[in-house]
Amino acid sequence: MYKHPDEEWLDEIPGQQENEDDDEIIWVSKSEIKRDAEALKALGAELVDLGKNALDRIPLDEDLRAAIELAQRIKKEGRRRQLQLIGKLLRQRDPEPIQTALDKLKNRHNQQVALFHKLEQLRDRLISDGDEAISEVLNLYPHADRQQLRALIRNAKKERDGNKPPKSARQIFQYLRTLAEAND
């Protein structure tokens, strides 16, 4: 590379060493910056919507936690401004651990909801099919009590036929839920 003799003083400036890795400039569009800022603001809104127990499971520093707790108490326009501040605070930090913890919380909730739907369907099959469904439950949960299941099913059928409240059906669901939790 040719250097003009008058430009030698540029070599003496600290931090101006030639480095081929630093020559590449990463250009980010203004729209992309805005999209990232909006995504972080949405992440902040999700954090504000969480309860105290869920917030305790997410790694937040004191400033961010205080801003989130304040936003939970504020209404209307002040809340919007506070969400803007939370987005700004998130831009100054690495949001990846926060997003990961939030995803785990959501995934855990979704898994629990899916398990409950599965148990409800199993309960309905137990009431409608009887012994065939009992053998399926015993295959899934070997430590289940066959006699207790049969008694609950018999009572649930009586309640259904008598148009009574489904007390035994709820008990079947509770029993299946305890079996599923014990199985984990």
From Swiss-Prot:
The keyword Chloroplast does not apply. GO terms for biological process: assembly of large subunit precursor of preribosome. Gene3D superfamilies: PSPTO4464-like domains (1.10.60.30). InterPro entries: DarP, DarP_sf. Keywords: Cytoplasm, Ribosome biogenesis, RNA-binding, rRNA-binding. One of its GO terms (molecular function) is ribosome binding. It is found in: Cytoplasm. Residues 1-21 are annotated as: Disordered. It comes from the Bacteria. Disulfide bonds: none annotated. GO terms for cellular component: cytosol. Pfam families: DarP. NCBIfam families: PRK05255.1-1 (NF003593). Member of a network of 50S ribosomal subunit biogenesis factors which assembles along the 30S-50S interface, preventing incorrect 23S rRNA structures from forming. Promotes peptidyl transferase center (PTC) maturation. Belongs to the DarP family. This is Dual-action ribosomal maturation protein DarP. It comes from Edwardsiella ictaluri (strain 93-146).
